[in-house]
């Protein structure tokens, strides 16, 4: 071939042929910043497993109880059909949860060697002093079956109750740990390598409330993992991957989400929207992969909701049962409107999204901190939708990323609003219910602030991480001051520190070294992550190619691993089509 001759052109000697372009670019490592952010995210959750004594997570007593019931071979239960286990009642009743009259440092607790197992405290016998049934029976069984598997491991049934709870918590930690990595991979699939993908990966590390929820026994954590995993193949769908096996993967992950929690019932809308937009963007019908996704998801998780309709004549029954549900709801008290409810909803969701530290609220970050973070996230995501991801229907494609979070928030709004109009209650308004949609929001936020930052967009990951670490420092300082500092040490900084460390060691299920190791890891990894972010801002990077406005042909789809390889080389693909 002569210099400057394009492949496929004709010369005097005949058509020129060329070797097909390599569609598999060299594999790249995950950026150091994303590895550091993921490690820091893990360390923060590990720290929270110690900062929060057993059963201080939201509804943690009942999540542990249901996992314990499944470990005994019981369940699923009808509404109102699961009384609290006597063993759970005994060990929970012996604690001051949350601290009522003072910090944990001043509350009595059994020495570590004298704490009984759940089995030794009464096992699965019916609770004697707590008559209210376990409401968690309304949830699908997957999370509890996973946790039950941990409780059935050899020797676990004989461990002290706080170590049993700690092991269950670590299952949650491992579920939420990959979130920064998955957010980065999803963003990179859509917009390529660069500051935008790094920003998306850093955002999950900025939420103290996420560190808290990820460190306790709660089925939200399985939903967070399932939806974050689902975002990655949906990003492939939006970029033209309409293969049947990708549809099967989408269906599998959607089905697992449906087996995690009822909030997942909004996800089929997001999946259908992604395939519809992919049809418009790439002008290829996705009916077969979409049908495969529907069938697989129904077989994996959709059956649970059909079962509810058949047995209980409703999609999700009240887990308390009719009698207790009516008692807890209370009598009607008219006079309130949806307009009255909206600002109350916004304030509570804002406080519990970036905050959500206590049980249920105190200690609490200032409203301007939690509200400022949430406003910034929403504003950045809206700009990200306006910018789009490039190519045909780019704004529509970007908007599908927000659908899970919007759907979760809409369900919360409707459920709590109905109760508020009925008699003024504000139940179920928790930021953790929206965390499963955080991956899509992180990508949109990163796109938006990247556009707003212009040439300074390279600094965004560093600034975001620094702001997030300051928020964490503020949050955990509040928690330690209220929960762990002995009252008699207030005013003496040295005594405050020694007293808090001593109290944490006393309440911990573990000896001193594993108790303090997560705190040391956070102290070490925080500057390491900041250094990695600073190096990422200084290191020049080639700009990612703009997504082609032309629809990608099926031949342009490859099987590369999104977590290990960059986006396809647009120039090579254009050459191949000539």
Predicted feature locations:
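Interfacial juxtamembrane loops and adjacent helix segments
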Residues: 72-168, 326-328, 359-363
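Transmembrane-helix motifs of polytopic, lipid-linked glycan transferases
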Residues: 163-190, 229
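Membrane-interface alpha helices of multi-pass inner-membrane proteins
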Residues: 246-262, 267-268
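Membrane-lumen/periplasm interface segments of multi-pass, membrane-embedded glycan/lipid transferases
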Residues: 305, 309-388, 497-519
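Transmembrane helical bundles and short interhelical boundary loops of multi-pass, membrane-embedded
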Residues: 363-369, 456-547, 551, 572-578
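Perimembrane helix-loop-helix junctions
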Residues: 239, 267-297, 388-389
């Amino acid at each position: 071939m002569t210099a400057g001759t394009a492949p496929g052109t004709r010369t005097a000697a005949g058509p020129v042929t060329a070797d097909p372009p390599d569609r598999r670019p060299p594999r790249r490592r995950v950026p150091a910043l994303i590895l550091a952010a993921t490690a820091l995210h893990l360390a923060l959750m590990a720290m929270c497993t110690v900062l929060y004594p057993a059963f201080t997570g939201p509804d943690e007593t009942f999540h542990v109880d249901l996992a314990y019931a499944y470990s005994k071979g019981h369940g699923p239960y009808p509404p109102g059909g699961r009384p609290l286990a006597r063993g759970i009642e005994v060990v929970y009743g012996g604690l001051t949860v949350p601290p009522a009259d003072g910090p944990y440092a001043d509350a009595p607790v059994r020495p570590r060697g004298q704490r009984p197992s759940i089995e030794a405290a009464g096992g699965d016998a019916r609770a004697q002093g707590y008559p209210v049934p376990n409401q968690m029976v309304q949830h699908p069984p997957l999370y509890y079956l996973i946790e039950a598997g941990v409780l059935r491991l050899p020797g676990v049934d004989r461990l002290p109750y706080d170590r049993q709870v700690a092991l269950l918590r670590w299952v949650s930690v491992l579920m939420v740990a990959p979130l920064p990595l998955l957010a980065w991979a999803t963003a990179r699939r859509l917009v390529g390598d660069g500051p935008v993908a790094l920003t998306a990966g850093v955002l999950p590390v900025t939420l103290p409330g996420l560190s808290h929820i990820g460190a306790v026994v709660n089925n939200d954590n399985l939903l967070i993992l399932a939806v974050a995993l689902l975002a990655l193949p949906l990003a492939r769908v939006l970029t033209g991957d309409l293969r049947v096996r990708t549809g099967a993967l989408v269906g599998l992950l959607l089905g697992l989400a449906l087996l995690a929690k009822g909030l997942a019932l909004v996800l089929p809308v997001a999946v259908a929207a992604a395939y519809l937009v992919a049809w418009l963007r790439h002008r290829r019908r996705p009916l077969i992969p979409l049908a495969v996704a529907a069938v697989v998801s129904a077989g994996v998780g959709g059956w649970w909701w059909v079962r509810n309709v058949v047995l209980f004549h409703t999609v999700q029954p009240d887990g308390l049962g009719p009698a207790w549900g009516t008692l807890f709801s209370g009598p009607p008290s008219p006079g309130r409107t949806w307009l009255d409810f909206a600002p109350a909803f916004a304030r509570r969701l804002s406080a519990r999204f970036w905050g959500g530290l206590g049980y249920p609220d105190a200690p609490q970050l200032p409203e301007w901190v939690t509200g400022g973070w949430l406003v910034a996230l929403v504003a950045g995501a809206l700009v990200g939708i306006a910018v789009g991801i490039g190519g045909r229907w780019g704004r529509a494609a970007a908007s599908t990323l927000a659908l899970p979070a919007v759907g979760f928030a809409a369900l919360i709004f409707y459920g709590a609003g109905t109760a508020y109009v009925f008699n003024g209650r504000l139940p179920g308004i928790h930021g953790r219910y929206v965390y499963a949609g955080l991956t899509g929001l992180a990508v949109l936020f990163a796109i938006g602030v990247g556009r707003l930052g212009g040439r300074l967009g390279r600094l965004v990951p560093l600034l975001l991480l620094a702001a997030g670490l300051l928020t964490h420092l503020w949050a955990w300082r509040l928690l330690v001051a209220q929960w762990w500092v002995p009252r008699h040490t207030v005013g003496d900084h040295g005594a405050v520190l020694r007293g808090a460390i001593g109290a944490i060691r006393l309440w911990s299920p573990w000896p001193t070294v594993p108790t303090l190791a997560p705190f040391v890891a956070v102290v070490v990894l925080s500057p390491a992550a900041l250094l990695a972010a600073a190096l990422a801002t200084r290191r020049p990077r080639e700009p990612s190619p703009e997504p082609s406005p032309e629809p990608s042909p099926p031949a342009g789809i490859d099987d590369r691993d999104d977590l290990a390889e960059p986006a396809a080389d647009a120039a090579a693909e254009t050459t191949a089509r000539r």
